Design a protein with these regions (language model features):
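Short solvent-exposed coil/turn linkers within tandem alpha-helical repeat scaffolds
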Residues: 2, 12-26, 54-71, 110-119, ...
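Extracytoplasmic/secretory-pathway proteins
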Residues: 4-7, 11, 21, 141, ...
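"A position-specific structural signal for the A-helix of alpha-solenoid helical repeats
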Residues: 1, 30-31, 38, 71, ...
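Hydrophobic/aromatic packing residues within the alpha-helices of TPR/SEL1-like helical repeat arrays
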Residues: 12, 49, 56, 84, ...
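Beta-propeller domains
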Residues: 30, 35, 46, 66-86, ...
Length: 290
């Protein structure tokens, strides 16, 4: 975060920093790959993401899945995206470029189904097929994103752009116009609704208000959501937000369980409940700002 990338690489290095086979090796190799991408060293990035994938696979086989599952998915995405960039630079008309794009599509398909990264993988694979001139497969990716699993839980507004681009390149102007109309219908009402919400916070309300409104929009009826529900669920699916929200819900349920048991009424229970309440009261406003 301080942009000291060389220092970071020193700590993440397989020999001088985080050794292979350690519990942090998958994350270390993955972060090193991100730095290589930042430095525009795509060949090295590809190698590091492949190392991260191997380390994450070994961790999963050993039963260490708490973090390795996500690193596995992110490493697969990293490999797919690097291949896409390499293929785009070389051009799909060259054998090397076409091969890189085909490898990109292959790795996007490796992202496990029904995970938080599945939708992104399908969408980005659609652009790979477009680059390869496989317009039917590209439109198939867009069609997949209209399934209820995706349409009800996260917004994919960019899929309309991909769809229109496919039609445009095939001179299907009427379908371009129809798709644009569908986009405006789907998202045209969301923008003013979102703008109205952003200006509706009561003056006396604290930052926690934003968090409360988001939670209500995610879980309540779509017609009553003050934030367009698909947008609210997109925000709530953010990895950092989801982890903090899970922690907050756990604090609330644990505190309720403690208060419900007569055995936990002594001084220690009081101190524990006070600590839980203080942690929750500090985190909720932060969640609103986040």
């Amino acid at each position: 975060r301080q942009d000291k990338l060389d220092d970071a690489l020193g700590f993440l290095d397989a020999e001088a920093g985080v050794p292979p086979g350690s519990s942090e090796a998958p994350s270390a190799r993955y972060l090193s790959g991100l730095i290589a991408v930042r430095n525009n060293d795509l060949e090295n990035a590809l190698s590091l993401f492949q190392d991260a994938l191997k380390e994450a696979s070994k961790a999963r086989e050993a039963g260490r899945t708490e973090y390795s599952d996500r690193v596995y998915r992110q490493s697969v995405l990293g490999i797919a995206r690097v291949y896409y960039e390499l293929g785009s630079r070389l051009g799909p008309e060259s054998p090397e470029g076409a091969k890189a794009l085909q490898q990109s599509a292959l790795h996007f398909r490796m992202v496990p189904r029904f995970t938080s990264d599945w939708g992104d993988a399908i969408f980005e694979r659609g652009w790979v097929h477009f680059q390869l001139g496989e317009f039917g497969k590209s439109l198939g990716s867009v069609h997949s994103l209209s399934a209820p699993f995706f349409a009800e839980n996260a917004q994919h507004a960019e899929s309309y752009v991909l769809k229109m681009t496919n039609y445009f390149y095939n001179c299907q102007w009427d379908r371009v116009r129809r798709t644009l109309g569908k986009f405006q219908k789907a998202y045209g009402e969301s923008v003013p609704k979102l703008e109205a919400f952003l200006g509706s916070k009561p003056q006396e309300a604290g930052d926690i208000w934003w968090y409360e409104q988001l939670k209500a929009s995610v879980t309540g009826p779509a017609a009553e959501a003050v934030i367009p529900q698909v947008l609210a669920r997109t925000v709530a699916s953010n990895n950092r937000y989801a982890r903090l929200s899970f922690f907050l819900d756990a604090l609330t349920s644990e505190a309720a369980a403690l208060r419900a048991v007569d055995l936990f009424k002594g001084e220690l229970a009081g101190e524990l409940l006070t600590a839980m309440d203080e942690a929750r009261e500090a985190l909720e406003p932060f969640m609103g700002r986040l």
